A protein has these predicted regions:
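Long, well-ordered, tryptophan-enriched scaffold segments
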Residues: 1-118
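A glycine-rich, hydrophobic/aromatic-adjacent loop/helix-cap motif
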Residues: 89, 106-107, 111, 115-181
């Protein structure tokens, strides 16, 4: 699941299919991260192996003299959230995603193209998921990758967009709200 959506994120970023005005206005993509922050080998900066704890002082944004977060609205600064995200998702090329998911590269590309086409002011795309996404040890990351896709495409807060959890017996309302029953 994470590899599949990681590949979609890479595809959106590599082909400039993100909704730039939306991304600049409604996300932290332009925010400049502390240059001391890092993420290597699955560990964030500040990890103390002896204490098994983090010093989180590098986990911050750069601020100006007034205490406001610095921005790079060109999204080119290597310390902006957008560039750090690009670097992180660069590993999810079609070949790797195909080998992890078992999905042929051509099929991945077809899905990525179709869904990325919703990243325009006159389009919308929704992601619907069921309990399976939540019943993994990486459930938070599953939902987070859905959120990143939808924020990049501007599909949050618009009619026909969003991320919608469908539930079974505990709450059938979600299914009926979406006219699926």
């Amino acid at each position: 699941d994470i590899a599949f959506r990681g590949g979609m994120i890479k595809y959106i970023l590599d082909h400039d299919l993100y909704f730039k005005d939306y991304v600049l206005s409604y996300t932290n993509a332009a925010f400049l991260v502390n240059p001391k922050f890092s993420f290597n080998d699955g560990l964030f900066s500040g990890y103390d192996a002896q204490k098994h704890a983090y010093d989180k002082s590098s986990w911050s944004f750069q601020k100006d003299g007034k205490g406001l977060i610095k921005r790079d609205d060109t999204l080119k600064n290597p310390h902006c959230v957008f560039q750090l995200m690009k670097k992180h998702y660069d590993r999810y090329d079609l070949k790797k995603v195909s080998s992890i998911t078992g999905t042929p590269e051509a099929d991945l590309l077809a899905v990525y193209k179709a869904f990325a086409a919703t990243g325009k002011p006159d389009k919308a795309g929704t992601i619907m998921y069921a309990l399976g996404q939540c019943h993994h040890s990486v459930a938070v990351q599953n939902i987070r990758t859905m959120t990143i896709v939808q924020l990049l495409l501007g599909n949050i807060g618009i009619c026909g967009g969003g991320i919608n959890a469908l539930r079974g017996e505990p709450n059938v309302q979600g299914s009926t709200d979406h006219a699926l029953l």
